[in-house]
A protein has these predicted regions:
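Short coil turns that delineate tetratricopeptide repeat
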Residues: 30, 64, 98-101, 135, ...
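Alpha-helical segment of the N-proximal tetratricopeptide repeat
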Residues: 32-58, 62, 239
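Residue-level recognition of tetratricopeptide repeat
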Residues: 41, 75, 112, 152, ...
């Protein structure tokens, strides 16, 4: 396929963010990334963020209107805790984007940048712009995904009212998809129950949280979305943690995705509550080295680094 800025931005996000639903393409359609992006990614995997940053900045200097170079630079700066500087590059990427898709990608990068600082309001401002793009393409599924991402940022930032609002928008919008299948309906229902359980747990409403956990399990047991089963131990561990049941939380979180920096961070928090400082630090170290630019890393990386230093 022809290599375009649009395709490069899409592939860049797909590699750096596991939740890269923006501009999603099938693997067969993914273009070859520019060599400097591949080199930077390898440096990041090796923990050499300074070297990756230098490489990306060099490319911005030589190609100041490169959307991928500006986005990549902003992502690395966020991971390094330099959000204000990162947003200069996301602003540039937004300004120079050559098409609506690339501009949406840059706006999403800006939203995640604010998530690294726990700023729900600012993140939502930019997620709304991405939502508007998906409205223009009448993509209801992507609208729901973006609304859920905004909600995730807000719950992790401690704004539970905003989180509830955006999760509800995500649920209701996702269901508007023309010709939606029963399985897709179940997916949105499972996500909505999952979200309500977490919000209730954070508000200290444990009985309500358990009601939603039970509802989520009932939907999961229908078997229409087997890939969602991996998210259930995370939910059980999350609810148990905020109920103060730390042994149960640890047991469940250990069944969740061990490569997710948010899960690593929660396991660290759980060990800390159990008085096992060394194990807590072990997991905080893991979480602090995440190289994703998504809500999970936006919460886990800054939180874990504060625990380590």
């Amino acid at each position: 396929m022809r290599l375009t800025v649009r395709n490069i931005v899409s592939a860049l996000l797909a590699v750096l963010s596991p939740l890269a639903f923006l501009l999603a393409q099938t693997p067969a359609q993914q273009p070859e990334l520019p060599e400097f992006i591949k080199q930077g990614q390898q440096l990041m995997r090796e923990g050499k963020l300074n070297d990756a940053l230098a490489l990306y900045r060099l490319n911005v200097q030589s190609s100041p209107h490169s959307t991928p170079a500006n986005i990549a630079t902003g992502m690395v700066l966020d991971l390094m805790g330099q959000g204000e500087e990162a947003r200069k590059y996301f602003s540039k990427a937004i300004a120079v984007a050559g098409n609506p898709e690339s501009q949406a990608a840059a706006n999403r990068g800006m939203a995640i940048s604010y998530a690294f600082e726990g700023n729900c309001d600012k993140a939502v401002k930019y997620e709304k712009r991405v939502l508007d793009f998906n409205k223009s393409t009448k993509n209801f599924f992507q609208q729901g995904e973006i609304a859920d991402e905004a909600a995730r940022i807000c719950i992790d930032s401690g704004d539970f009212d905003a989180a509830y609002k955006w999760y509800k928008i995500g649920y209701e919008t996702g269901l508007k998809e023309p010709g939606i299948t029963a399985a897709r309906r179940d997916l949105w229902s499972f996500r909505w129950e999952h979200a309500q359980a977490r919000i209730a747990a954070r508000r200290g409403n444990q009985a309500e949280a358990q009601t939603h956990v039970t509802a989520a399990k009932a939907i999961l047991d229908k078997g229409t979305n087997p890939e969602q089963a991996a998210f259930f131990p995370y939910l059980q561990g999350y609810v148990a943690f905020y109920a103060g049941n730390f042994k149960e939380a640890l047991e469940e979180l250990n069944k969740a995705n061990q490569n997710d920096p948010f899960i690593q961070c929660m396991i660290g928090q759980t060990y800390e509550k159990l008085g096992e400082k060394d194990r807590a630090l072990e997991y905080y170290r893991k979480a602090s080295t995440a190289i994703f630019h998504n809500p999970a890393a936006a919460y886990a990386v800054p939180f874990s680094k504060k625990k380590l230093f």
